[in-house]
Amino acid sequence: MVSAGFINTTDIDTTANQTNIISTSTEIVSTSTIKTKDNVASKVKVYFADAPIMQKIAYCESRNRQFDKDGSIFRGIVNPRDVGVFQVNERYHLADSKKMGIDIYTVDGNLEYARHLYESQGTQPWSSSRPCWGNYEKLAIK
């Protein structure tokens, strides 16, 4: 689920007993409301309906978490540079994800970048969690 809202800003100059409107702007702001594990799991299931192995990988990597309970990005325990539901590593992938216009810190962006990795490299980027999802490898398309 994605919600959108408007933010109106007005800059006002109140010097010398005058009020002058300097500028006014309106921005459309979109925020993802997918915060809970269940909602993330549902989103992963729909997004990777054609690649069920990725649903297993998301569970094994993060237990379907994009965010911690305090709302901060979920980071890996072994490597805190692994972020989000697919534990995309900042060191290896942040620059490329930014070049592609993908924000790996959002649910949608993390899934989109995981799709990119899967389509270009198969399940290899998640080989460290293979003991968890490897029994389901027959679900893999690549």
Across the structure, where does each feature detected by a protein language model lie?
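N-terminal, intrinsically disordered, polar/charged segments of Gram-positive cell-envelope systems
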Residues: A4-K35
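Catalytic glycan-binding domains that act on GlcNAc-containing polysaccharides
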Residues: I22, I28-K142
